[in-house]
Design a protein with these regions (language model features):
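Mixed-charge (Asp/Glu-Lys/Arg
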Residues: 1-164
Length: 164
């Protein structure tokens, strides 16, 4: 079954040994419009590029040194902005509270003003309960598709039967 887009109801150190050069995955996305067909690195790259389109400065982290962070971004808006840590999960199944707890701990450890957890699937009620009243945004598959569409990227999420 294919998810539909759902409209959501949300000084940066650019020299860091965790950062890697990233490619522009968006130019190749037309060839593989199903996000579930991207490998994990391509998906993380897509998320980094998306947040750049949203208006953030963003850097992809090295897998071996990410400390639970896939993208470190900076939101330049006065008062509302700051350092943002982003975790990308290309999942078929429900993302539970443990992933949100991990992101929150990483966010505090990194001194970030916000954490964003992005998934191709959806979150369980316990994940939303934990994130409530915290500077954490949970972006599910429908909201991700909506955000991509808002920035001119037509994509879809179709879960293959054998994917976990």
């Amino acid at each position: 079954s294919e998810l539909q887009p759902v409209k959501p109801v949300v000084e940066f150190n650019m020299v860091d040994k965790r950062f890697v050069e990233q490619s522009d995955i968006l130019t190749d996305l037309d060839n593989r419009p199903n996000l579930m067909e991207l490998n994990p690195f391509e998906f993380e790259n897509l998320i980094s590029n998306l947040f750049r389109l949203v208006g953030f400065e963003s850097k992809l982290t090295r897998s071996s040194r990410d400390g639970g962070i896939d993208v470190v971004a900076y939101d330049p808006r006065p008062l509302l902005g700051g350092k943002v840590v982003i975790q990308a999960k290309r999942y078929k199944n429900v993302v539970g509270v443990s992933a949100v707890r991990d992101l929150y701990g990483t966010m505090i450890n990194e001194g970030a003003s916000k954490g964003i957890l992005v998934t191709t699937s959806h979150y369980g009620p316990d994940a939303y309960d934990f994130a409530k009243d915290k500077p954490i945004e949970l972006l599910d598959g429908g909201a991700l598709l909506y955000l991509l569409n808002q920035h001119g990227i037509e994509a879809k999420i179709i879960f293959p039967d054998e994917f976990n």
